[in-house]
Each structure stands twice: as C-alpha cells, then as structure tokens.
Amino acid sequence: MMVDPLYKGGLTKPLCSSGLRPITDSCVVIPNFDNSVRSIIVVNILVFAGILYSQFRNTLSIFSLWCPNTRAVFLFICPCLLYFYQGIFSTDEQIGTFNIIWMLRRLTIELIIRNLNAEKER
C-alpha cells in the first residue's frame, strides 16, 4: 500500500500491477519500462564507465591500432553513441528516466574539453 495525499477515497490505495495505465481510483500507477529502455540505460552507463576508465588509464589497445590520438577519438565516439541511442528510444513517458543520462552527457562533454585542453598544453 502506498499513501496518496490526493486520493479522496481513503488514505491509501494499492499499486497497479503493471504497465503505464491511466491513474484511476483503484490503484497507483508505477511505470513499467520495457527491456529496450533498461538496456539503453545500461549501455549509456557502460559507455560512461569506459570514458572514465580511459581518463585514468592511458592504454586503449583496441583504438591504438587505428589512430595515434586514441583518447580523443574514443571521447568523440562515446557522446555520439549517447545521442544516437537516446534519440531512438526516448518517448514522452520515458523522458524522466533519462535524467541520469543527461548528467552523464554533461560530464562527458566536460571530460572531452579537459582532455583536449590537456593535449593542447603538451
């Protein structure tokens, strides 16, 4: 049972079992996101973890075969992936879940700027 101060039928009402249904007098709606949204959130978090890892470790052996400036390439690709994945899967009902991803984007852009400034100073 969950307390709902706006509910006029009593102090508490049960939670809805599943789905994004309209709020009725019988239950409280809990958003039930499908697997695509969960997987996109996980992908974004993993990408951001990779960005942090690349900031603290100088070795990225996969990318070093392709380009000498590996960290700049890696930090350019990751935000593009963030925008690509969220652009496909975001809807009006799910936009609240992506607040964490917006924060990760800001941090990603900050890391890119710091990385590029550090490389200019070298």
Curated annotation (Swiss-Prot):
Residue spans crossing the bilayer: 36-56, 72-92
Cysteine disulfide partners in this protein: none
Annotated localization: Membrane
Induction trigger: Silenced by SIR3.
Keyword presence, Transmembrane: yes
Cell inner membrane among keywords: no
Official protein name in the record: Putative uncharacterized protein YFR056C
Tree of life domain: Eukaryota
Keywords: Membrane, Transmembrane, Transmembrane helix
This protein's GO CC annotations: membrane
Further remark: Partially overlaps YFR055W.
Organism of this sequence: Saccharomyces cerevisiae (strain ATCC 204508 / S288c) (Baker's yeast)
UniProt membrane topology term: Multi-pass membrane protein
Main subcellular localisation: membrane
